[in-house]
Amino acid sequence: MHDIEYIRQNSEEFEKAMESRGMKEFSAEEILKVDHKKRLLTTKLQDLNRQRNEITKKIKELKMSKSPCEKQIKSSKNITNEIEAISLKEQMEKDKLVNILSNLPNIPVQGVPIGAGENSNLEVRRYREKRQFDFVPKSHYELGERLGLMDFEQAAKISGSRFAILKGQLAKLGRALINFMLEMHVNEFGYTEVYHPVLVKNEAMYNVGQLPKFSDDSYLTTDELRLIPTGEVVLTNSVADKIVEEKKLPIRFTAYSECFRKEAGSAGQSTRGMIRQHQFGKVELVSITTEDQSNDELERMTGVAEEILKRLELPYRVILLCSGDMGFAAQKTYDIEVWLPEQNRYREISSCSNCGNFQARRMNAKYSLEANKKVKKYVHTLNGSALAIGRTIIAVMENYQNPDGSITIPNVLQKYISNGTVISK
């Protein structure tokens, strides 16, 4: 949610920011008109309430002196009726303003490349040389099906398209990755592990910017609960409607979450197998910070996600997203892309974003200053995948495959799989 005062004072700058987010020929005029109308009604209400209070005081004085007060009582009733009518109009304008602002994305911070799509993204760094194969590398789905450990056909019979069943050593590999990631985040980087619901209210989705704009992308149950598209929804909402002491920030949470999205993706090689699923597992990171901490926290969070790939010895690159390619709530985002040999390209495996106070305004999350506890400011929120489990499985399978179709288990994971070293038939 945007600060209306900022829009009043910086309408042209705000328009440019929205245009950089892909809203062509955006104008702040409608926002300012609705805001002006609402403010006039608010001023009128304040004046009427003042008049009614004065009349009420006068009525009390007249009654105490046993003087006639019918005229004042009638006047008070008329003002009350007028207040009720104007209050309804004011609420309508408030709702209209909130609806407009709720559908507008966050403003990019300085340093974010301005552009419409991925061609304007900026590569920041790379890690590790790509493995040179002396055979033609196979895809993860070909490897998995040949091993008899990955079943898309039966999953489709049970649940439809875009689902997968993993069995045996591949299922263990997924569990090993979850344990490895969570233990690293908790034991080495100070995150608090959270076990949380996967069904949430619409309000929780609204707070993080998933609603109203992306309503059709999530699964809605018959009792108006939604399956989470990311663990960020629950972890970020942990501070909704709260005031946190500044000295307790930053707060860092991590959780393994089953996530659900309706996206079907486009047909073709890039979406075959487990690349884009309706249900997928993800280890999430969320940080709640002061406004002064969030920039450094984004760098730290991205570094934590990178550390997983470094320990798995997987080639990757870090991309700074341009203004038109960022998520709705983000003001700055780094994507981490892992190398997939069979596809001969990098694919996203993590996205780490600083949302500033955008989500905090929607969910009314603040912190009290240590120097003056009466002063409250909106917290800053950050979120990142560290990492998407399915895509990490894919990356391990494709980068660690052997000529016979077996898969070498990365050293760092072997202790989680009974010291196994190879996945084979």
From Swiss-Prot:
Catalyzes the attachment of serine to tRNA(Ser). Is also able to aminoacylate tRNA(Sec) with serine, to form the misacylated tRNA L-seryl-tRNA(Sec), which will be further converted into selenocysteinyl-tRNA(Sec). Pathway: Aminoacyl-tRNA biosynthesis; selenocysteinyl-tRNA(Sec) biosynthesis; L-seryl-tRNA(Sec) from L-serine and tRNA(Sec): step 1/1. This is Serine--tRNA ligase. Its main location: cytoplasm. One of its GO terms (cellular component) is cytoplasm. PANTHER family: SERINE--TRNA LIGASE, SERYL-TRNA SYNTHETASE. Consists of two distinct domains, a catalytic core and a N-terminal extension that is involved in tRNA binding. Its EC number is 6.1.1.11. Keywords: Aminoacyl-tRNA synthetase, ATP-binding, Cytoplasm, Ligase, Nucleotide-binding, Protein biosynthesis. L-serine binds at residues 230-232, 284, 385. It catalyses: tRNA(Ser) + L-serine + ATP = L-seryl-tRNA(Ser) + AMP + diphosphate + H(+); tRNA(Sec) + L-serine + ATP = L-seryl-tRNA(Sec) + AMP + diphosphate + H(+). ATP binds at residues 261-263, 348-351. It is an enzyme of class 6 (ligase). It is found in: Cytoplasm. One of its GO terms (molecular function) is serine-tRNA ligase activity. Homodimer. The tRNA molecule binds across the dimer. NCBIfam families: serS (TIGR00414). Pfam families: Seryl_tRNA_N, tRNA-synt_2b. GO terms for biological process: selenocysteine biosynthetic process; seryl-tRNA aminoacylation. InterPro entries: aa-tRNA-synt_IIb (IPR002314), aa-tRNA-synth_II (IPR006195), aa-tRNA-synth_II/BPL/LPL (IPR045864), Ser-tRNA-ligase_type_1 (IPR002317), Ser-tRNA-synth_1_N (IPR015866), SerRS_1_N_sf (IPR042103), SerRS_core (IPR033729), tRNA-bd_arm (IPR010978). Belongs to the class-II aminoacyl-tRNA synthetase family. Type-1 seryl-tRNA synthetase subfamily.
